[in-house]
């Protein structure tokens, strides 16, 4: 079995994330794409949307797609989970012959700082979602995406133009409510 893991905060999920999901399904030779929202990203202190809400948005957007599985492993841990731990969990579950780990190009600069990076690098092939034409090292796969949007922009401005139609109204109401509190 060939699998790919796309983890993230998804706070909120947006068209950039959607582009990564659709490109991965189209361009990678995989049997399963596992989308795994984080409980708390090891590199962030907090989220705006709680883990249950982010999981529901992700499930609503991509849970119906063929080959896609929405996984709550990291959320169930109720703590920051390093990627290596999620990868080992999925290895035990699926024993894949090929394992792709999808990450944004913005993570490249600090990738070597990730927990147990050497072991992680030996277990997966990194696929870089490249939205800014950043030079991707030759030992990584380049997954071109055409969306240049950040979740923080959506949260800060309440501009939901780049939020997927299926959840646009929910996202706007959710963050408006947070801003009022």
UniProtKB/Swiss-Prot annotation:
Superkingdom is Bacteria
This chain belongs to which protein, by name?
A: Probable nicotinate-nucleotide adenylyltransferase
**Sequence similarity:** Belongs to the NadD family.
InterPro entries the UniProt entry points to: Cyt_trans-like (IPR004821), NadD/NMNAT (IPR005248), Rossmann-like_a/b/a_fold (IPR014729)
Enzyme nomenclature, EC number: 2.7.7.18
Q: Which UniProt keywords apply?
A: ATP-binding, NAD, Nucleotide-binding, Nucleotidyltransferase, Pyridine nucleotide biosynthesis, Transferase
Against SUPFAM superfamilies, the record matches this protein to: Nucleotidylyl transferase
Q: Name the HAMAP family for this protein.
A: NaMN_adenylyltr (MF_00244)
State a single Gene Ontology molecular function: nicotinate-nucleotide adenylyltransferase activity
Does the keyword Nucleotide-binding belong to this entry?
yes
Species in which this protein is naturally found: Campylobacter jejuni subsp. jejuni serotype O:23/36 (strain 81-176)
> Is Nucleotidyltransferase among this UniProt entry's keywords?
yes
- Record field: catalytic activity: nicotinate beta-D-ribonucleotide + ATP + H(+) = deamido-NAD(+) + diphosphate
Q: What is the role of the protein in this entry?
A: Catalyzes the reversible adenylation of nicotinate mononucleotide (NaMN) to nicotinic acid adenine dinucleotide (NaAD).
Extract the coiled-coil ranges from the record.
none
Q: What class of enzyme is it?
A: transferase
Q: Which NCBIfam families match?
A: cyt_tran_rel, nicotinate (nicotinamide) nucleotide adenylyltransferase
